[in-house]
Amino acid sequence: MPHLTLEYTADLPRGVVSRQLFARLHHIVVEVTGADIENCKSRSIEHGNFLVGESSDGAGFVHLEVRILEGRTRDVKTELGRRLLGALRDTCDSAGWDAQVTVEVRDISRDHYFK
């Protein structure tokens, strides 16, 4: 915990999803939630077959799912989502990539998380 899963479409310019991006996201998670950085785990999934709306121009997306142990306040989860969204938007903008960018923050049940 925390777990970050970054899904993105194959039209994302190469090199955007990197250890540097994950490190930036990890630091945001630590700053906002107080989690131990050594427990942050990130992975990415590229989607080659996708459709956004009815678009035929191949517009893509980035979606970050963040799972943290339950117990954080609504305000903490809102701040976390907003800051991560800002970092992802900045990254996409810097790469010149126009895509839908979303973040979802989910709780992990302490009763059902085993380590």
Q: What are these model-predicted stretches?
A:
Residues 1-115:
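A domain-level signal for the structural core that forms small-molecule/cofactor-binding pockets
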